[in-house]
Amino acid sequence: MIVTDDNAVLYIDERKLTDEVKEYLQSQGISLAPYTGIWQALKEYEKDTLMIHKNKCNAAVALSIGKKVVYRGNSPIALMKAVKNEVEIKGFERAMLSEGVAMVKLLRWLKPAVEKGGVTELDVDAKLTELRSVDAAFKGLSFATIAAYAANAAIVHYEPTPAENALLAPKGFLLLDCGGQYLSGTTDVTRT
């Protein structure tokens, strides 16, 4: 995307956008152009200076800039997004409340189920998804759940499989890194 004082152009494969999204972008003053057009647009960019996101610029973009003076910094958009309005705050609160209810129900189920025996990491994942699904606002996972027991909790981005799926016992630690997509927001929770 190239944003200037006068306009904003999103370079994208328009087949990826619905008509509704296209109309919305245009109503916000954002023009659409073919994804591959950004290279030429950067070469033809008339101003002498340009700011690029220091962590998001790839080599092709850097090579297309030419001899312009480039400022590498953090996106001012990210800074603006960090300031939340009341609607966003309420949405986060609703999403976290929904997630909290599911987590409390999971913990209430977990202790007696583990003491009874036969609960695996995959069972914990499935039970949490089941408990979230009771909420009509739940639309799916925000990322794959990590339910890691004992030594598995030390494995970065561990994901149990039917072949490698620890049986829980009433001792030790269970790491739960999970998140849900709700109509009002997205959650990311890590607990032991």
Question: Where do the PLM segments sit?
Answer:
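Active-site neighborhoods and metal-handling regions in enzymes and metal-associated proteins
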Residues: M1-T192
